[in-house]
Amino acid sequence: MNVYPPFKDKLEILSEDQIFSVLVSFDDLSNRDKFIKKYNRLDIISKFDFIPSILVNLKKEQIFNYESEALIKQIEENQIVYPAMLDVNKILELDDYKKSEISYTGKNVKVGIIDNGINEKIPALSKVSLKKFKLYDVEKPIKENGEISHGTVMASIISNRFEDSDGNYIGIAPNVKIYDFDISNSHQEHSFNDILRVFDKICEEQINLDIIFISLTTKNSSDGKDLLSLACDLLSDKNIIIVCPSGNFGPNYYTIGSPGAAKKVITIGALDKELSISNFSGRGPTLDKRKKPDLCFPGSNILVPITNDLRLNVSGTSVATATGVGVIALIKEYDSNITHDLLMDLFNKSKID
């Protein structure tokens, strides 16, 4: 069976004429290239090397016609991924900041953030070590303090350079090196193929990362066998810790999307101020009945200072995940050799159920 089962179920109830953006994956690059040669009239939008696959637009009939093709490993929908942050409310004037007594600051830890770009010009990110990678050539109007994208908020939670009354940076890991993988585009919508292109870039350019933070998730639940989840598992095998939100589609069970359902990513849910699971936080199990999320961090009504006159009150599992990424960066600074499995052992021994 070559059609990904959740996608096949969806196809059964949709019209014959509808065109789908689909990802076709293969066991290896050789099979992919043989397929392209065999079906040379097929209009291929993109090719991916890290996990051998192509992006094409197909009708329902075409998808089922390819189902018996031996060269194909799997056909699935190129699903849209959504930022896992809820409403943002602007609040004027800053309060005093919580004193930080942590001796580690994430120094020399490399964190890749896959999101819609980071505005490093805001005061909160002043002098943060940041390297930009732009996936698409799209011009965005950048205002010095006005471009507050989802990615900017995520980076501000991790590396905020505002100081508390004792002169400590309030960011959880203010000295990490941030790699900004900006997947923003002209239609302001993101799909699996955007993240797969980032993975190709990381591998092709041999970008050395310790942590990858994917702050996006699908609406549809996943069993961890979709292409993006499988790609995350493969990248994790390169000793990169991948961290994802559980999504904001709770409180029902089976609301973990992709890539949060991947077996080798650390999936994080959100807690409210009383340290109870937030109502919106995605719940497990995954579609194949594995326990997720792996951890929960505070993610409801978190105040994030952006400028001297502006702070944001933010909620969402991506907010909780940014907090988790900061904590993981501190641990990574302490033990640069720690792996995903050892990190999970550490969390499992210290977490409160």
Regions found by a protein language model. Name each.
Residues 1-10, 32-100:
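Autoinhibitory propeptides
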Residues 76, 179, 241-243, 267, ...:
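Structural detector of well-ordered beta-strand residues that form the stable sheet scaffold
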Residues 101-113, 117-131, 142-191, 210, ...:
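Subtilisin-like serine protease catalytic core
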Residues 120-121, 248-253, 274:
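Active-site environment of divalent metal-dependent phosphoester hydrolases
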Residues 125, 130-131, 272-321, 345:
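Catalytic-core environment of secreted peptidases
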Residues 157-158, 179, 183, 299-353:
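Hydrolase catalytic cores
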Residues 183-263, 287-290, 305-321:
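Substrate-binding/access-modulating region of protease and related hydrolase catalytic domains
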